[in-house]
Amino acid sequence: MAIKSDQISSLIKQQLEKYDSTLKIDEVGTVTYVGDGVARASGLANVMSGELVEFENGVYGMAQNLEESEVGIIVLGDFDGISQGDTVKRTGKVMEVPVGDEMIGRVVNALGQPIDGNGAIKTKHTRPVEFKAPGVMQRKSVFEPLQTGIKVIDALVPIGRGQRELIIGDRKTGKTSLAIDTILNQKDQDMIVVYVAIGQKDSTVRTQVETLREMGALDYTIVVSAAPSEPAPMLYLAPYVGAALGEYFMYNGKHVLIVYDDLSKQATAYRELSLILRRPPGREAYPGDVFYLHSRLLERAAKLSDELGGGSMTALPIIETQAGDVSAYIPTNVISITDGQIFLDADQFYSGNRPAIDAGTSVSRVGGDAQIKAMKKVSGTLRLDLASYHELEAFAQFGSDLDAPTQAKLARGRRTVEVLNQPLHQPMPVEHQVIVLYALTHGYLDDIDVSDIQRFQKELIDFVSGDKSYKKIFAAIKKTGNLPDEKDINSAIDDFKKHFSKSVEPTDYVAPSTKQEANK
């Protein structure tokens, strides 16, 4: 079969008409140095700060230092496959991570990739890792309580949804345990939790994940982990990745709790990166913008206005101190950024008070507006009572000849400290806390020995919960947030005390008549 030349030319013309010529220009540079999670490259004259660049082996990096002839790049992954002389090209994009409901219940690394062995995560959305915090007019005042389930916090240092509350203390004083207990208490609270482990040992993170799984808390929690064995860029980025994961839910009208455990290690990783990038060191060898490192992260936690959906993101950053020194550089920076701090005292921890919260130095600047009325009523004098107890306790060591009112204050103080002690991983609903603190502040525990206090409060809660005529007290507090008729509460506690069996009679009990006579 013969093919005519005009047919061939016609086919060629048709193909040429379909051909679309597009010119693609890539700006390519050359790697001049690589090591310790950092690379330097020349030839990327137009690269932007924070822009993603791609190395020859497919690993990505983020442009950080924009210098006259070179660009300092932090490598997002394994830098062993990158060599001097390799090509590196611009992408024109910023770093983004996958976000969405599919991330809940998973453990991911600082790039949002799963590391829990449960397969790939397929999400429909991504968010930039760096994102501008909401402005003044995009926010709303904090007014909704975030119940931690920890009596001493909910009573003395209340936290509201959208607040930034710092947890600060020496190593091994219970900072992480406090955060984990708060996460456990968010069950049935319509809350999504992001737990960011920065520089925590893999074995420690595994233990925390198993605790969350056993308690049913992993069903509403995302865990972001950057292990100490990973390069410094991973530890630096992990908190921002966690914030991006939380922001997705916040901007969709949901409530989020995010825990950064801990930001001291992020600051150390950032110092390491900055020194390798040859940025001028400042105080304690940190770079000049270390304050901005944390401020731009923590400002992303907010209570959004109704126009933006009314969602919130509450941040609990953790900072580790050395020998209780809160005046060091990083602690003072973060204290000035946050809306209050919970200070954990090593002396209290080793004396057996758990959680070891120092009520005198711990403060919540905005949480009081979010505290429920019932808790305000029963905890109003608690801080002063504790302060006067600690003062009297120090004074009482010098002599035993004390008058009756002083003895009564010391006895009440011992019971207050014992009531505020709480076992690990046993958060208490706020309505139960209110009844226990009511019994304490109204003198119902004065004739109960300190050794019986924990059993007394547990049995009191069981009694009120199980009694048909009294369980409405808990329901009323939960529904209205206010104290019901005090006659009902007094009646319930009086009835319970008739059935409560003391294991021992208190030796420090001061009868009311003795107190009154001494006052005369």
Swiss-Prot record:
Q: Which positions bind ATP?
A: G169, D170, R171, K172, T173, G174, K175, T176
Write down the EC number.
7.1.2.2
* One Pfam family cited in the UniProt record for this chain: ATP-synt_ab_C
Top enzyme class: translocase
Cite the GO molecular-function annotations of the record: ADP binding; ATP binding; proton-transporting ATP synthase activity, rotational mechanism
Which SUPFAM superfamilies would you find in this protein's record? C-terminal domain of alpha and beta subunits of F1 ATP synthase, N-terminal domain of alpha and beta subunits of F1 ATP synthase, P-loop containing nucleoside triphosphate hydrolases
A GO cellular component term found in this entry reads: proton-transporting ATP synthase complex
Which superkingdom?
A: Bacteria
Enumerate the subcellular locations listed in this protein's record, separating them with semicolons. Cell membrane
Mind telling me which InterPro entries this protein's record contains? Answer: ATP_synth_asu-like_sf (IPR023366), ATP_synth_asu_C (IPR000793), ATP_synth_asu_C_sf (IPR038376), ATP_synth_F1_a_nt-bd_dom (IPR033732), ATP_synth_F1_asu (IPR005294), ATPase_a/bsu_AS (IPR020003), ATPase_F1/V1/A1_a/bsu_N (IPR004100), ATPase_F1/V1/A1_a/bsu_N_sf (IPR036121)
The membrane topology noted for this protein in its Swiss-Prot or TrEMBL record is: Peripheral membrane protein
Catalytic function, reaction form:
ATP + H2O + 4 H(+)(in) = ADP + phosphate + 5 H(+)(out)
Q: Where is this site: Required for activity?
A: S362
Query: Does this entry carry the keyword Translocase?
Result: yes
Which UniProt key words apply to this protein?
Answer: ATP synthesis, ATP-binding, Cell membrane, CF(1), Hydrogen ion transport, Ion transport, Membrane, Nucleotide-binding, Translocase, Transport
Task: Give the similarity note.
Answer: Belongs to the ATPase alpha/beta chains family.
Q: What does this protein do?
A: Produces ATP from ADP in the presence of a proton gradient across the membrane. The alpha chain is a regulatory subunit.
**NCBIfam families linked:** atpA, PRK13343.1
- Subunit relationships: F-type ATPases have 2 components, CF(1) - the catalytic core - and CF(0) - the membrane proton channel. CF(1) has five subunits: alpha(3), beta(3), gamma(1), delta(1), epsilon(1). CF(0) has three main subunits: a(1), b(2) and c(9-12). The alpha and beta chains form an alternating ring which encloses part of the gamma chain. CF(1) is attached to CF(0) by a central stalk formed by the gamma and epsilon chains, while a peripheral stalk is formed by the delta and b chains.
Q: Which protein is depicted? A: ATP synthase subunit alpha
**Origin species:** Oenococcus oeni (strain ATCC BAA-331 / PSU-1)
* Protein's gene: atpA
